[in-house]
A protein has these predicted regions:
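Hydrophobic anchor at the beta1->P-loop junction of P-loop NTPases
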Residues: 8
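P-loop (Walker A) phosphate-binding loop of NTP-binding proteins
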Residues: 11
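Conserved lysine of the Walker
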Residues: 16
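Conserved substrate/cofactor phosphate-moiety recognition/catalytic segment
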Residues: 25-63
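A basic- and aromatic-enriched beta-loop-alpha substructure that forms the phosphate/nucleotide-
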Residues: 64-102
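A glycine- and Lys/Arg-enriched "phosphate-lid" helix/loop adjacent to the NTP-binding pocket
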Residues: 90-162
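NTP-dependent small-molecule kinase module
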Residues: 139-215
Length: 215
C-alpha cells in the first residue's frame, strides 16, 4: 500500500470524519479536516440560505486554497495525509446553493474567483467514497444530537445526497473505492475497519466496490 494522500468523502452524516480520523491515527498521518463548524457564515446560511450561501462557499474556498498549500508542503516532506473532504467538492455544493441566473449570477462569480485564486490542486492517490442511503445519513445526523439536523433548509439534505451520487458516478480524477456505508461501521467495528484496509491494499484499477456481503 503506497498511498500518500487519501481522501474520505461522503454525504453529510455518512461518517467520513470518523473514518478519516481513524485512518489518520492508524497510518500516523496528518488529518486534514474541513471543519464546517468553524465557518462563521454557516449559521446565517442555515437561517437564510439565499442571502448567505455565497459568503459561506467563499469561506470554504479559501480553506481549500490553504489546504492545497498544506498538502503540497506535506508531500514535499513525504508525509502521509488523510483528508475528510475532496478539494473539488464545491462542484457538489455550488450548483445547488448559488444562483445561476441574471442579474447577479453568483455561480459565475464564484467560479471566476476560484479560477483566479486556486492553485493547481494535488490529486489524491485514493478516494474512499462512503455511499449511504438518505435514511442512514439522516440517522447519523440524529445520533450527533447537536441540533444541526434542525438547522438545514427544507430539502437541502436530499439535494446534497443526490448530488454526491451524481458527482461520484462521473468522477474520474483519482482511483475511487466505493464503500457500502449502510452496511459498515468503521468507527466502532474493528472487523469492518480491517476489511477496508484489505480492500485498500488490494485496490486495482480506477474503481472498486466494497460490500460487507462480498468482503
Amino acid at each position: 500500500m503506497h498511498y500518500r494522500y487519501i481522501v474520505v468523502e461522503g454525504s453529510i452524516g455518512s461518517g467520513k470524519s470518523d473514518l478519516s480520523r481513524r485512518l489518520a491515527e492508524y497510518f500516523d498521518a496528518l488529518h486534514l479536516t474541513e471543519s464546517p463548524e468553524r465557518n462563521p457564515f454557516l449559521e446565517s446560511f442555515y437561517m437564510n440560505a439565499s442571502n448567505h450561501a455565497l459568503a459561506s462557499e467563499l469561506y470554504f474556498l479559501m480553506n481549500r486554497i490553504e489546504a492545497v498549500e498544506v498538502i503540497n508542503v506535506e508531500e514535499e516532506k513525504n508525509h502521509m495525509i488523510v483528508a475528510d473532504f475532496l478539494l473539488e467538492n464545491d462542484q457538489i455544493f455550488v450548483p445547488i446553493l448559488l444562483k445561476d441566473r441574471e442579474p447577479g449570477n453568483e455561480q459565475t462569480l464564484f467560479w471566476q474567483i476560484k479560477h483566479r485564486l486556486m492553485p493547481e490542486m494535488p490529486v489524491p492517490d485514493l478516494v474512499i467514497y462512503l455511499q449511504t442511503s438518505y435514511e442512514v445519513t439522516h440517522k447519523g445526523l440524529q445520533k450527533r444530537n447537536d441540533g444541526m439536523l434542525n438547522m438545514f433548509p427544507p430539502g437541502y439534505l436530499e439535494m446534497i445526497h443526490e448530488e454526491y451520487g451524481r458527482f461520484f458516478h462521473l468522477y474520474q480524477n483519482a482511483p475511487v473505492l466505493i464503500v457500502n456505508g449502510d452496511e459498515m461501521d468503521f468507527a466502532n467495528n474493528d472487523d469492518h475497519f480491517e476489511m477496508l484496509l484489505r480492500a485498500m491494499s488490494n485496490m486495482q484499477g480506477s474503481r472498486h466496490y466494497l460490500n460487507l456481503s462480498e468482503a
